[in-house]
């Protein structure tokens, strides 16, 4: 198996290194990741300047761009072969519910999915890298399952509780939950007395009932959510056609 690995925390992130170490024994891996933390960059591509590719002493490639840039350049400019799978992570912090729209971790996987390649995004619930070896072991378990019964070009979002491997409950299929709207921005002043703003924290859980990613991970399960690119609101499509008729 040939696997492309990326992330949004940067090429030096412990989660990326742990994921690469876990998958190297079972696959030929290529790692292409941002040069720095690009959390929250979503699916953005850098179009206003050229990008540069560097290679670290451990063989990892790193790019002064977004996670989507990294996967795009890896597939169209660096790799001499087409990978069988793209994995992203392991992210420091959850990517559940509305988080998936902003997540650079999910975006890296999505970019590969857009190229017709199966992709999986891996995230830990809590920041701080606690139980990272456990999360990496879960990632390897999931990659080895192959998911032959899924459509050929699947896109999965995996969230892993920060628990010892032996304490984790079995992985379950989930849907995305929902959050309340984000908290207000945090206003401050720079050294020159000018107003500056920090984006506020994410909103709390709004839809976290049974069957959601929020609920599953709260019970100690690994959550696996199948994602899709089509954002069409099909329930409103027929009504809109009537309005426009």
Curated annotation (Swiss-Prot):
Locations listed in the record: Cytoplasm
GO terms for MF: 3'-nucleotidase activity; 5'-nucleotidase activity; exopolyphosphatase activity; metal ion binding; nucleotide binding
Cofactor(s) this protein cannot do without: a divalent metal cation
Record carries keyword Repressor: no
Binding site for a divalent metal cation: 8-9, 39, 91
Reaction(s) catalysed by this chain's protein: a ribonucleoside 5'-phosphate + H2O = a ribonucleoside + phosphate
Note accompanying the cofactor annotation: Binds 1 divalent metal cation per subunit.
Record family assignment: Belongs to the SurE nucleotidase family.
Protein's job: Nucleotidase that shows phosphatase activity on nucleoside 5'-monophosphates.
Name of the molecule in the record: 5'-nucleotidase SurE
Gene behind the chain: surE
């Amino acid at each position: 198996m040939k696997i492309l690995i990326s992330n949004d925390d940067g090429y030096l992130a412990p989660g990326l290194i742990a994921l690469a170490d876990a998958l190297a024994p079972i696959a030929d891996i290529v790692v292409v990741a941002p040069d720095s933390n690009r959390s929250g960059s979503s699916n953005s591509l850098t179009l206003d300047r050229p990008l540069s590719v560097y290679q670290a002493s451990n063989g990892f490639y790193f790019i002064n761009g977004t996670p989507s840039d990294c996967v795009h350049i890896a597939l169209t400019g660096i790799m001499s072969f087409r990978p069988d799978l793209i994995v992203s992570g392991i992210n420091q912090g959850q990517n559940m519910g509305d988080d998936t729209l902003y997540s650079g971790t999910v975006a890296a996987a999505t970019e590969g999915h857009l190229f017709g390649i199966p992709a999986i995004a891996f995230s830990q619930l809590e920041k701080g890298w606690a139980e990272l070896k456990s999360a990496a072991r879960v990632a390897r378990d999931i990659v080895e399952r192959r998911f032959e019964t899924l459509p050929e070009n699947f896109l999965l979002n995996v969230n892993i509780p920060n628990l010892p491997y032996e304490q984790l409950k079995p992985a379950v299929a989930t849907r995305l939950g929902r959050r309340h709207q984000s908290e207000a921005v945090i206003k401050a002043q720079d050294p020159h007395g000018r107003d500056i703003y920090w984006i506020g924290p994410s909103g709390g859980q709004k839809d976290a009932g049974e069957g959601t990613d929020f609920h599953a991970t709260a019970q100690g399960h690994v959550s696996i959510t199948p994602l899709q690119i089509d954002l069409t609101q099909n329930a409103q499509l027929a009504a809109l056609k009537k309005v426009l008729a």
